[in-house]
């Protein structure tokens, strides 16, 4: 693994297993991590496990205002964001032919639109620091 001492990572979907493991790996490599998700309890448990260099930022990625605020909150908490892990995603357990337009749009809002908005929200700061990892 790389030495990420002094780097700051924002991980979405960190309240789930994959996001939690990503946060653990980046933290173990020396990064400060901002862990984000919709469920506060698993985020707080992960933060307690990691100890220092961790910030809990709840965010519902289906809310455009919350998505816009998340990169700013992460940068304020950590000083900057050098690494963005767009791990969060949703599915609607339904046959495609039965999926409503609203269900389809909610999946796209979280899995695609929020991803683009988060990238856009952190990119300027990453470019200034000349260290970009998306």
Say what each PLM segment does.
Residues 119-120:
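A short, exposed helix-loop element centered on a Lys and neighboring polar residues
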Residues 29-45:
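Conserved glycine-rich Rossmann-like NAD(P)H-binding loop of the short-chain dehydrogenase/reductase
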Residues 8, 15-17:
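Conserved glycine-rich cofactor-binding loop
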Residues 52, 73-84, 92, 103:
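A glycine-rich helix->loop->beta "capping" turn
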Residues 58-70, 101:
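The beta1-alpha1 cofactor-binding region of Rossmann-like NAD(H)/NADP(H)-dependent oxidoreductases
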Residues 7, 79-81, 126-134:
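Active-site loop of short-chain dehydrogenase/reductase
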Residues 95-96, 103-108:
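Substrate-binding pocket helix/loop in short-chain dehydrogenase/reductase
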């Amino acid at each position: 693994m790389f030495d990420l001492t002094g780097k700051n990572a924002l991980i979405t979907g960190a309240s789930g297993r994959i996001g939690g493991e990503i946060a653990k790996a980046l933290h173990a490599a020396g990064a400060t991590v901002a862990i984000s998700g919709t469920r506060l309890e698993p985020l707080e448990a992960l933060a307690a496990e990691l100890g220092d260099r961790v910030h809990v930022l709840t965010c519902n990625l289906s809310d455009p205002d919350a998505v816009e605020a998340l990169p700013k909150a992460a940068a304020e908490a950590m000083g900057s964001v050098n690494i963005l892990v767009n791990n969060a995603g949703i599915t609607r357990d339904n046959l495609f032919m039965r999926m409503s337009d609203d269900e389809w749009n909610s999946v796209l809002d979280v899995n695609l639109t929020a991803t683009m908005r988060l990238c856009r929200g952190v990119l300027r700061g990453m470019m200034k620091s000349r260290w970009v990892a998306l």
